[in-house]
Amino acid sequence: MFALLTPDLGNTEIFQLIGGEIASLARVHNYSLVWGGSSQPRPDPDLSLQHAEELCHHFIDRRVSGVFFAPYELVSEKEEANQKMAETLREAGVPVVLLDRDVTPFPSRSDFDLVSLDNFAGGYLATEHLLKLGCRRVFFVARPRSAPTVDARIAGMHEALRRWRIEPTPNWVQIGDMADRKFTRNLTTAPRPDAFVCANDHTAALLLRVLQQAGLRVPQQVRVVGFDDVKFATLVSPPLTTIQQPCRELALTAFRAMLDRLADPTLPARHITIRPRLVIRDSCGAYAPRKEGRGG
């Protein structure tokens, strides 16, 4: 029996998809899968830190063979709690494979197996696309207390700017609540950016609405890139250019990592990354002819 501990299951589409793929793989290999505290893929949007810690002990009592764990984000005490839960499982002899994010801040690495998108490369790829379109004032937008994956995307964006010999605009990383009018007003007032890279598609969709309410046309006046390629990315107007999360490949890689860990518990911890893919839609427009040479 395996267990899946994903606090964002009820709120994040990618973890529903990854969890479903892991469940299918478990059945093929004659394992059952416990989703949180249930044997069914039932979202638990109220999975508090305390409840999650209780579930860890529940998994230990049930003698699960391993736990797939997507660490918490968006809570102030997430780092300590994530590390505590992972260590509790390991001390009980339960293998842990982390999904999507680490239990430590970027760029540090824990000594747990981790399977994720190459978020640094994703941030680079999204930014490079905008630079090829002629954008030069590019901002990054994220929610407070986001996962370490967001910091990796920011680092990738910074590297793209450096490679193109573009000095980042002051305050180019904007962390705030898209429901905060003061925060969103700062995003749309002069001198405003000519493009945004968003930490995820949800933030990008909210930003599209903010820009449209401010009378700004996307992509004619400002371009937007999201991250994840969730279903609604094609439903917003204009449809989002985004970095795709390859959920099936992430699930398959994580499941193989768990089987490897069970076969040889002495293996060194691994961070296995999946190459990102840019999905180009209307929120950025098409590629424009390049007028400037690229920096080396």
Describe the residue ranges of each PLM region:
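Bacterial carbohydrate/catabolite-sensing allosteric modules
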Residues: F2-L4, I18-R42, E54-F68, E73-G296
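Extracytoplasmic "Venus flytrap"
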Residues: L5-L17
